[in-house]
Curated annotation (Swiss-Prot):
CDD domains: Ribosomal_L18_L5e (cd00432). Part of the 50S ribosomal subunit; part of the 5S rRNA/L5/L18/L25 subcomplex. Contacts the 5S and 23S rRNAs. This is one of the proteins that bind and probably mediate the attachment of the 5S RNA into the large ribosomal subunit, where it forms part of the central protuberance. Belongs to the universal ribosomal protein uL18 family. One of its GO terms (cellular component) is cytosolic large ribosomal subunit. The keyword Transferase does not apply. This is Large ribosomal subunit protein uL18. Gene3D superfamilies: 3.30.420.100. The lineage of its organism: Bacteria, Bacillati, Actinomycetota, Actinomycetes, Mycobacteriales. It comes from Corynebacterium jeikeium (strain K411). GO terms for molecular function: 5S rRNA binding; structural constituent of ribosome. GO terms for biological process: translation. Residues 7-19 have a biased composition (Basic and acidic residues). Keywords: Ribonucleoprotein, Ribosomal protein, RNA-binding, rRNA-binding.
Amino acid sequence: MSNTAQNEKRLPVGKDISTRRRTARARRHFRIRKTLSGTPETPRLVIHRTSRHMHAQVIDDVAGHTLVAASTMEADVRAMEGDKKARGAKVGQLIAERAKAAGIEAVVFDRAGYKYHGRVAALADAAREGGLKF
């Protein structure tokens, strides 16, 4: 089978590019999640990115509980001036503060299929600077 035929088989034919990108990201996230799992000692820091906002959660996958969360939809981040990258960094600082307050020192970073670039990298770097170990 040729390479083109394999690609056509994987991506929905006749769908627009945004659907293909969303499907490809979901597949990447599924592949990543097969190997990543959060435990009570090192929970999983997962992010979700939309065109306007970012959400970050620290999850214990064994118990199935969200331990701490932060988002750009919170009042202090919403009132902040700056671009989306700066707001992502602020979410990283908040998630690190809240995780430290909950007694969490180390996490497993789940980028959820997004490229480690821009807002995703800014959030991760700010969380590291806030004291979380990845």
